[in-house]
C-alpha cells in the first residue's frame, strides 16, 4: 500500500492517484495540534473542507467498479467529534497523533508529581496531611505521571533529534505542547469509538462507510463550534 501527501488541492490528489500510483492520499496542511505551518508559511485550508473536496475527487476516480484511491485526513482532530466530522466529510482513514499524547503508553518527556505525607501530633491529636506536588520531596515516596510534552515533526527539536542537524534554510513549523496525563490508551480509544458510534446513531448511519451519505452539513459560528451554549460551558 502506497501513501503520499500531504495535499489540500484536489488536482494534486488526482495526479497522485492517476500518475503516481498511490493508493491513499493524505489530506491536510497546517492543521496539527502542534503545527504552526499556517502562521509561518501562510499555507493551508480548513481540514473539513480539505476532506470534503479531496474525497469527492478521489472517490470519483474508478478503475471498473473499484475505487482508484482513498483519502486519509491528517491533522486537526482534537476530539471524537472532529474524527466523526472527518468521516462524514468522506475521509476513509483518520490519522491521529497529538490526540493520544499523554496516555500511559507514551514514551517521551514526562513530568511527575510526588506524594508527600506529613504526620503531626499536637496535644495528643494526630493529623495526617497527604498531597501530591510537582517537587520531589527528597525521600522515597510514590510518584505518578502528571503531564507529557510533545512536539511537531517540523520543529527544530524534531529536526535536531531525527535528522542530526538543522537545515539553515528551513523554518520551524511546529511548537511544543504540554498535556495532562490521560490514562491508559484503551480508555481513550474506547471514548473515541463510542463517539463515532453515537454519531452514526444520530445521523442514521449503519456503518462508517455510509456516514457521508447520511450526514447533513451546516455552517456554525465560533460560539456553537467551541462551546455548549445550552450549558454555558
Language-model-detected regions and their locations in the chain:
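Glycine-rich tight-turn/loop motif centered on a GG-T
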Residues: 1, 30-49
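Catalytic cores of alpha/beta
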Residues: 8-27, 77-92
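Short gly/pro/ser/thr-enriched loop/turn and capping motifs at secondary-structure boundaries
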Residues: 10-11, 31-36, 100-105, 111
